[in-house]
UniProtKB/Swiss-Prot annotation:
It comes from Staphylococcus aureus (strain NCTC 8325 / PS 47). Residues 68-186 form the MTTase N-terminal domain. [4Fe-4S] cluster 2 binds at C223, C227, C230. [4Fe-4S] cluster 1 binds at C77, C113, C147. The lineage of its organism: Bacteria, Bacillati, Bacillota, Bacilli, Bacillales. This is tRNA-2-methylthio-N(6)-dimethylallyladenosine synthase. One of its GO terms (biological process) is tRNA methylthiolation.
Length: 514
C-alpha cells in the first residue's frame, strides 16, 4: 500500500483518556490497524510499493524540539537498533537533543520487541516505571513504538492500563514521527497511528548512528516465510527490497566516513532482490558489489537456510571483506518439528547446505538459533537436535525456550511440553553449546588474529575488547588510541566464550581490504 492509497482509506485514531477503561479499542483500528491474521497477511505482492527518495521534514516542524531532549530505550534485534538510529535522526532534525538522563528527558520513546513474551513483559514493566515521571512532569511525552505496537492486544492493554503513554506508532510509519509528535503536543488524548499494511520504501531518512566504527545497513524490510511460531511477518510486513544502488551508495558513504565494519540487515537477507521486478539481482550480487568497496568487514544477518544459494556461497568463498562467519538458524534437528514450524527445509537438506558451505569455505564459522520445547516436541525429537549440533559442530548458538505468540499459528497448538522439561532440555543443549564453543576457541591459542577494537572491556576499563572476522570476542591490553582500529593480537588464553591476548601492532587497512 503506497502513501496515496493509504491517505484515501485511512482514518485518524484518537482514544479519549476518560473513556479508555470501559471500551474494546479494536474497533478503532478498522482502517489503520488490524491484528495479526495469517490469512490476510499472506495476501502479499498486490499492493504497489514505491521508492520515495525525496523525504524531507516539513519546515513547519523544524524547531519543534528546540531546548527539548529525548531518550530512546531499545529492545530486541538489530533491526530495532537500526530503527532507533532513524528515530534519533528525525528527532535531532526537529531540534531535539539526546540525553541519557531519563528523569530530565522531554520525550521518552520505548522501541519494543514482540518476538518473545519475556521481551514484552520487560516493556510493560518499563512503561509502568514511567508513571511516576508522568505524574511529576505531565508535559513530557511518552511513546511506544516498534513491533509490539503492531499487535492489537498490546495497544488495547496500553490504552486500558497505561494512561501515562501519549503516543503509539508502529514499524511502518517512523517517517511520520513529526506529525505524530505535533498531534501529541496538541491533543489531550492518546495519539495512536499504527499501520497494519506496509507503506513505501523511504530513502534518505536521517540517522544518528551509534558510534563510528560499525554500522547497520538495512537492505530489505519484512518477511514472507511465516514460520508458525513467529510474529515478525505480521509486525514487519511483506518483503520489500531496497534498490541496490541505494544500498551501495550508503555503503560507499560509510567507507568515506571511516567505518570499519557494516552489517547488512533484513529479517531474511537471503530473500533480497526477489521482489525487484525490473532486474535479476540477489544477495550474492549485492555482496559482490560491496566487496569492491574499501570497507574492511562486511557481515549479513539474518539468513534463512531455504534461500541460501550456491551463488552466495561462491561469493563468500572469494574472501575479501566478506567475513567467513555465517549465522544459519536451524531451530530444530527433527523433520516433524521443522514441518510444524513451517521452516520449509528438512534436516537432510540443512546438512547438505552445511556441507556445501564447508566444502567451498573451509575456514567458515557457523552459528545458529535453536528453539527448545516446541509444541509436541518429544524427547526423541529433541535428541535429534542434539545430534545435528554434533554433526555440524556449530561454534556458537542462541538458544531459547519456545514462547507462544498470540496471532501466530503455533498459538493455536497445545503447548504440551511441561516447563520443567523445556528447562531441562535447554540446560542440556546449552552444555553442548559451551562444549563446542570451547573447542572452537581453543584452536586460537598461540595464533595471531586480526581484531576490530571497539572500546574498553565491559569488565575492566584498562582492557580493550573487539571481535575477529569470525565474531570471536578478544580482550587485550593496548593504548586507547587503538580503539576503532584493526589490530593484530596474539591469543594467549582461550575461554569458553572469549579469548585473551597480547597486542602486537595496528593493521593498516590496505592489509585487510582485498
Amino acid at each position: 500500500m503506497n502513501e496515496e492509497q493509504r491517505k484515501a482509506s485511512s482514518v485518524d485514531v484518537l482514544a479519549e483518556r476518560d473513556k479508555k477503561a470501559e471500551k474494546d479499542y479494536s474497533k478503532y483500528f478498522e482502517h489503520v490497524y488490524q491484528p495479526p491474521n495469517l490469512k490476510e497477511a499472506k495476501k502479499r505482492g498486490k499492493q504497489e510499493v514505491r521508492y520515495n527518495r525525496d523525504f524531507q521534514i516539513d519546515e513547519k516542524y523544524r524547531g519543534m524540539g528546540n531546548e527539548r531532549t529525548f531518550l530512546i530505550k531499545t529492545y530486541g534485534c538489530q533491526m530495532n537498533a537500526h530503527d532507533t538510529e532513524v528515530i534519533a535522526g528525525i528527532l535531532e532534525a526537529l531540534g531535539y537533543q539526546a540525553t541519557t538522563d531519563i528523569n530530565t528527558a522531554d520525550v521518552i520513546l520505548i522501541n519494543t520487541c514482540a518476538i518473545r513474551e519475556n521481551a514484552e513483559n520487560k516493556v510493560f514493566s518499563e512503561i509502568g516505571n514511567l508513571k511516576h515521571l508522568k505524574k511529576e512532569r505531565p508535559d513530557i511525552l511518552i511513546g511506544v513504538c516498534g513491533c509490539m505496537s503492531q499487535e492489537e492486544s498490546v495497544v488495547n492493554k496500553i490504552l486500558k492500563s497505561y494512561q501515562n503513554v501519549d503516543m503509539i506508532f508502529g514499524t511502518h510509519n517512523i517517517h511520520h514521527l513529526p506529525e505524530i509528535l505535533e498531534e501529541a503536543y496538541l491533543s489531550k488524548a492518546m495519539v495512536v497511528e499504527v499501520w497494519s499494511k506496509e507503506g513505501d520504501v523511504i530513502e534518505n531518512l536521517p540517522k544518528v548512528r551509534e558510534g563510528n566504527i560499525k554500522a547497520w545497513v538495512n537492505i530489505m524490510y519484512g518477511c514472507d516465510k511465516f514460520c508458525t511460531y513467529c510474529i515478525v511477518p505480521f509486525t514487519r510486513g511483506k518483503e520489500r527490497s531496497r534498490r541496490p544502488e541505494d544500498i551501495i551508495d550508503e555503503v560507499r558513504e560509510l567507507a568515506r566516513e571511516g567505518y570499519k565494519e557494516i552489517t547488512l540487515l533484513g529479517q531474511n537477507v537471503n530473500s533480497y532482490g526477489k521482489d525487484l521486478q525490473d532486474i535479476e539481482y540477489d544477495l550474492g550480487d549485492l555482496l559482490q558489489a560491496i566487496s569492491k568497496i574499501a570497507i574492511p568487514r562486511v557481515r549479513f544477518t539474518t539468513s534463512h537456510p531455504w534461500d541460501f544459494t550456491d551463488h552466495m556461497i561462491d561469493v563468500i568463498s572469494e574472501g575479501g571483506n566478506i567475513v567467513p562467519h555465517i549465522h544459519l538458524p536451524v531451530q530444530s534437528g527433527n523433520n516433524a518439528v521443522l514441518k510444524i514450524m513451517g521452516r520449509k527445509y528438512t534436516r537432510e537438506s540443512y546438512l547438505d547446505l552445511v556441507k556445501r558451505i564447508k566444502d567451498r569455505i573451509p575456514n567458515v564459522a557457523l552459528t545458529t538459533d535453536i528453539i527448545v520445547g516446541y509444541p509436541n516436541e518429544s524427547e526423541e525429537q529433541f535428541e535429534e537436535t542434539l545430534t545435528l549440533y554434533d554433526e555440524v559442530g556449530f561454534e556458537h548458538a542462541y538458544t531459547y525456550l519456545y514462547s507462544q505468540r498470540d496471532g501466530t499459528p503455533a498459538a493455536k497448538m497445545k503447548d504440551n511440553v511441561p516447563l520443567n522439561v523445556k528447562k531441562e532440555r535447554l540446560q542440556r543443549l546449552n552444555k553442548k553449546v559451551g562444549h563446542y564453543s570451547q573447542i572452537a576457541m581453543s584452536k586460537y591459542e598461540g595464533q595471531t588474529v586480526t581484531v576490530l577494537c571497539e572500546g574498553s572491556s565491559k569488565k575492566d576499563d584498562q582492557v580493550l575488547a573487539g571481535y575477529t572476522d569470525k565474531n570471536k570476542l578478544v580482550n587485550f591490553k593496548a593504548p586507547k588510541e587503538m580503539i576503532g582500529k584493526l589490530v593484530e593480537v596474539r591469543i594467549d588464553e582461550a575461554k569458553q566464550y572469549s579469548l585473551n591476548g597480547s597486542f602486537i601492532k595496528e593493521v593498516e587497512p590496505e592489509m585487510v581490504i582485498q
